């Protein structure tokens, strides 16, 4: 059923122009060599003993070179005489099932065959103690396989969180608590409210480190182009001191959309592999409960989502941040996985499906006509692949002068209709 009378569809949308955004391109020259060197630091290598059963905790984010990093760590542990295995550390992702979480890892090339070690996936958890916050007392739990290992190694990306600000946000502490907490632990911690996470997550992580055999963490930082910028092995007793420093580095490497105002933002794809919120609030300025605090990016009036990523496996948690979604995208949503994740994270808003539109033109028109003060003859439209890959964007005619004035932006000699745009 059309959203508008036939005459409204006669409005011709402006051509889109390809623009390159310039950020710091520094990245690791050799990821494998860096991992091996870090593993052989005295304070790291001395923690590994022959015969140890070591749980490598791996999450659900689409991290560049993740399979290579996991494989290299596993190889080095085996060379040291240890017996490593992988446990999914992703809270309620993968539909909140053991099989689903294994499938998420498989999507990243992390399988028993590829890595050469077992993958032990279970929702069974062990209670290890309690922590306090203003909302009450919460029982902290840890994956059963990890809790009974001789050593635990969380492997994860450090970056700003999507819902709160604090000295420690997304990273090793979150992996140890929400990730290894599986569905039960994730639900319990989120039930306390993300407003308490700046202190709750570090406190819970300290309990995990004190009560379980956490050896060290593998901290990964990416640059603005989704490339591996930094890898560091952090001993367990230094995680709480080092992670805030790593977060500052990660924050400085975050990309952004370098225009000031956007009437309609079209996002080609979203998913849990891109961000816990499907679309990173640090990029779009929208979080589960409104505008993201201290957001310094563009003022975005309306957002249209075209599709889900393959590696999100139908989990559209965060789709509620959009205003409109293509009908074809909505039909690919796994409601079970989406609702499980949204409810366990205390964010039912993120699981609400926006108004469905038949095609891109109808979606963009809906964005423009529901915006405030939009000049329909010169709309400011931006098209991105996702919120992780922002080295290239497409902008409408009305933004060209702003692009030309910004030394970080390069206007290319390419144009396309937004209806036909599909970034690779």
Regions found by a protein language model. Name each.
Residues 281-424:
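C-terminal non-catalytic interaction/assembly regions of soluble proteins
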């Amino acid at each position: 059923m059309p959203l508008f009378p036939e005459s409204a569809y006669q409005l011709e949308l402006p051509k889109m122009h390809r623009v390159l955004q310039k950020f710091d391109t520094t990245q690791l020259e050799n990821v494998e060599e860096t991992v091996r060197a870090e593993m052989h630091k005295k304070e790291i290598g001395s923690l590994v003993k022959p015969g140890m059963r070591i749980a490598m905790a791996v999450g659900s984010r689409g991290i560049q070179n993740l399979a290579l990093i996991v494989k290299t760590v596993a190889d080095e542990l085996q060379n040291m005489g240890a017996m490593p295995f992988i446990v999914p550390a992703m809270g309620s992702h993968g539909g909140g099932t053991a099989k689903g979480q294994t499938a998420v890892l498989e999507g990243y090339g992390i399988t028993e065959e590829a890595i050469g070690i077992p993958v032990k996936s279970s929702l069974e958890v062990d209670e290890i103690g309690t922590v306090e916050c203003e909302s009450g007392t919460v029982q902290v739990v840890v994956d059963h396989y990890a809790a009974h290992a001789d050593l635990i190694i969380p492997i994860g990306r450090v970056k700003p969180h999507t819902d709160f600000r604090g000295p420690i946000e997304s990273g090793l502490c979150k992996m140890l608590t929400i990730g290894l907490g599986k569905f039960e632990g994730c639900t319990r911690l989120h039930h306390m409210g993300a407003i308490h996470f700046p202190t709750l997550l570090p406190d819970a992580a300290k309990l995990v480190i004190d009560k379980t055999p956490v050896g060290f963490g593998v901290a990964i930082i990416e640059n603005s182009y989704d490339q591996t910028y930094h890898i560091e092995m952090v001993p367990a007793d230094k995680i709480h001191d080092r992670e805030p420093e790593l977060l500052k580095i990660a924050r400085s490497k975050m990309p952004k959309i370098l225009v000031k105002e956007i009437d309609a933002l079209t996002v080609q794809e979203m998913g849990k592999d891109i961000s816990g919120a499907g679309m990173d609030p640090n990029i779009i300025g929208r979080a589960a409960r409104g505008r993201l605090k201290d957001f310094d990016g563009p003022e975005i009036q309306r957002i249209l989502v075209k599709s889900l990523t393959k590696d999100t496996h139908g989990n559209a948690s965060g789709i509620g941040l959009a205003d409109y979604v293509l009908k074809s995208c909505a039909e690919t949503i796994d409601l079970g996985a989406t609702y499980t994740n949204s409810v366990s994270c205390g964010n039912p808003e993120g699981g609400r499906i926006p108004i469905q539109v038949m095609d891109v033109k109808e979606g963009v028109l809906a964005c423009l006509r529901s915006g405030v003060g939009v000049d329909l003859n010169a709309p400011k439209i931006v098209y991105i692949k996702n919120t992780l890959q922002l080295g290239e964007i497409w902008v409408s005619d009305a933004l060209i002068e702003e692009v030309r004035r910004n030394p970080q932006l390069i206007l290319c000699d390419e144009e396309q209709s937004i209806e036909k745009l599909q970034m690779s």
